Amino acid sequence: KKEARDRGLWNLFLPDSDYGAGLTNYEYAHLAEVMGRTHFASEAMNCSAPDTGNMEVLVRYGSKEQQDEWLKPLLNGEIRSAFGMTEPQVASSDATNMEATAELVDGHWVINGEKWWTSGAGDPRCKIIIFMCVTNPENERHQRHSMILVPMDTPGVEVKRMMHVFGYDDAPHGHAHMKFDNVKVPYENVILGEGRGFEIAQGRLGPGRIHHCMRSIGAAEVAFELMCKRSMERKAFGRELARLGGNFDVIADSRMEINQARLLTLDAAWKMDKYGNKVAASEIAQIKVAAPIMACNVIDRAIQMHGGAGVCQDFPLASMY
């Protein structure tokens, strides 16, 4: 991290900002792909999720007090953060179903509810959660929710368990199942204002999807390279694996699919820069589907080409998948 910062490779993700490198979404997308080639690059350059999205929220929507208390240490890499949106009892594809609540009592928010897949909450450096919940149930359905800053050490905040993905717990970062029991924070901890949670979410999730998709493309490129290397070095029945069955077709399909996903994602990034997140909503939705499907397909093919080695610790393919 120190070397990355000394070289100016720090907070590269913040577009049009005095805090970062001033890169556009399109420009940063290429860097995100390179960072996706290894699991620690984003961490080294202070460009890890969910901190990137949380910092963008605080830059765009946070008050000066919120920025001084939480944005500055995040930008300096001194602390980590979490994002709490998904809940265990409702369909996460429809966030208007959210059940967690915050009630205003004597100038404080009293928060109750559960969240899971709370990204970043397992990191011991995590000090703050951006928590989305219902604050104004009487409003129109997309104006009922707010985002509130909740310090991790607030009484009533409990990490119930860490969620595993295919057996991997993503330590030391991780995704937590959390409970919030009468958690009390000042009214001033609400970001932007009451009922503006969805407005913030749309601003937050667009750039994050560019980052995630391009990192997935970077990972797919690594899997592709490993697949090509293995297919030419490994022999069966006197021939290289690449020359058996339809393996050349598998390699060719992977090359085309990676290129297609990259171009689709870069198009979305360009459109966000030129016209804004709202106009680019369709393209952002497309890449959220296309890039992960492509990455899963390419990594799966690479695993198959490696045989048993593909699912063991000797190669990164299993954890990438």
Spans of features found by a protein language model:
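Alpha-helical interface subdomain recognition
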Residues: 1-42, 46-48, 61-66, 73-78, ...
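Short glycine/proline-enriched turns and hinge-like loops at secondary-structure junctions
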Residues: 23-25, 93-96, 121-126, 140-144, ...
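Short, conserved phosphate-binding/catalytic loop or strand-edge motifs used
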Residues: 48-55
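Flexible, glycine-rich active-site loops centered on histidine and acidic residues
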Residues: 55-61, 83-84, 138
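A short, Trp-centered hydrophobic/proline-enriched beta-strand micro-motif
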Residues: 77-86
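Glycine-rich phosphate/pyrophosphate-binding beta-alpha loops
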Residues: 91, 116-123, 207-211
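Flexible, small-/acidic-enriched active-site or ligand-binding loops
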Residues: 97, 155-184
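A short core secondary-structure module
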Residues: 107-108, 112-160
